[in-house]
Amino acid sequence: MNADFLLPYYTAQSGSSMSMFNTTMGKLQRQLYKGEYDIFKYAPIFESDFIQITKRGEVIDVHNRVRMVTMGIARTSPILPLPDVMLLARPATGCEEYAGHGQATKRKKRKAAKNLELTRLLPLRFVRISVQDHEKQQLRLKFATGRSCYLQLCPALDTRDDLFAYWEKLIYLLRPPMESNSSTCGIPAEDMMWMPVFQEDRRSLGAVNLQGKGDQDQVSIQSLHMVSEVCGATSAAYAGGEGLQNDFNKPTNVLNASIPKTSTELAEEPATGGIKEAAAAGAAAGAATGTVAGALSVAAANSAPGQVSAAIAGAATIGAGGNKGNMALAGTASMAPNSTKVAVAGAAGKSSEHVSSASMSLSREGSVSLAIAGVVLTSRTAAEADMDAAAGPPVSTRQSKSSLSGQHGRERTQASAEGCKEGRERREKDRALGRSSHRRRTGESRHKTRGDKIAQKSSSRSSFSHRANRDDKKEKGCGNPGSSRHRDSHKGVSHTPISKESRTSHKSGRSLWTTSSGSSKGLGRVSSFLRNVRANLTTKVVGTPHGRDVNVMAKMAERSTNVAIAETAEGGQGLETVGSMTPDIMETVTFEAH
């Protein structure tokens, strides 16, 4: 071996290079050995001649000439295990070098021919080499700019037949098919963010930069082919991580947004039903305590129609005690809203005024019917009123509490309770005086018997009025209390017994006034009681507001009037008082007869 071919470090024919390339020095390596590029002066190069073709395999000719390309794979440092540079050269054109000429010398021409001209020098990290067609021995080069070049092997006549197999082996070494993520050289991680990639991999450049900003001491062994795959996977993993985070956060947001919506939807309906049930239950509870009108009107305003009817029925059953009036109220309340209007209108009265007021609104209608029910439930005889007075205030006074303010209701309750109690005591004393006078005065038995008959008629009349109130449930105020003739045109059948009873009561009052002159002490007490009753009635009637409470006051006046009649008939005094209260009685009877 000549000394000219001996290299300081190694040559292509040395052991390492021969085991790697198994070829002799080519013309490109000989040209570089001359020192034009000092870095490649002693570098081993594996090279071959190719012709440039298209993707379809057609030969590219420029000016009817085939374009020849010499491609060499070189290793710039002996410490590198694999080649790191790709060189591209083409045949050089002839050129002439002109030497300087003087005035006394001749012009000299020297032609210096160059075999190859180096056109490209690319690191292998920026080039992807692949086999395009094995049979036609075609390769594909893809550059970092995104452009691709197709080359077909054009070996010389004296080359080996298995030259393309060496290229396949080299491609396999540069990028092993089983381990495609290996690289041909070490790439520092900090250099990767400045490394240009191919056009199809530019979408992953952000992921490369993020990956390259890790530890500065790390060395990446990923090849250029792996950059797109790994970067794509890394970006996908990073996006997937964000997706997972978004997915983890998204259900939380959805949960936070849907819990109010779900809790609102699920809570509103049961809450509404619960409020309605609570309103119905509260209505029944309020009815049990005696505030039937107020509680049931609230239930009618806040509850459904079915629940209103159930609440009214239950309230009437609990609060009334099971009498006939209670049964009528329950039957009316269990009807539909339209039927309830008709029933209430019929119960209130047949005049157009009551019908229009009943059909204006359901809540107002309910209050009117409840006021009438209060009159019916509390309209009893004098004996029942005496029995109830010993137990406590009547139901009508408790209903008047819910209608009026608390202070006025308590005063009226106390006044009515005291009035009933005093009336019972006076009746007992008067009955005792009447019995003693009957024993001492036998000659006056005929007058006494007539007075007893009048008392019985008055009591029967009061019981008849109470029964009429239970059946009709009508409001007060249809006639004029001052004119009996005007009421006669409206009363009809009830005119005759009322007028007879009133005349009989006047006559009996005169007879009792003349026959009971001996009992001055008892009669003085009766007159004081009647004055108290008159004062109570005046204050109550004046202070009563217009509306549903007028019915309760009319009932209370009726009860007090009945008591006054009984005492007057037995005591024999108070003719003027009886005359002034008789129109009230007649008015009440007129209300019941409609």
UniProtKB/Swiss-Prot annotation:
Residues 387-524 are annotated as: Disordered. It is found in: Golgi apparatus. GO terms for cellular component: Golgi apparatus; nucleus; sperm head. Residues 408-433, 442-455, 468-477 have a biased composition (Basic and acidic residues). GO terms for biological process: cell morphogenesis; Golgi organization; penetration of zona pellucida; spermatid development. Keywords: Golgi apparatus. It comes from the Eukaryota. Residues 396-406, 511-520 have a biased composition (Polar residues). Belongs to the GARIN family. RAB2B effector protein required for the compacted Golgi morphology, probably through interaction with small GTPase RAB2B. Interacts (via N-terminus) with RAB2B (in GTP-bound form). This is Golgi-associated RAB2 interactor protein 4. It comes from Homo sapiens (Human).
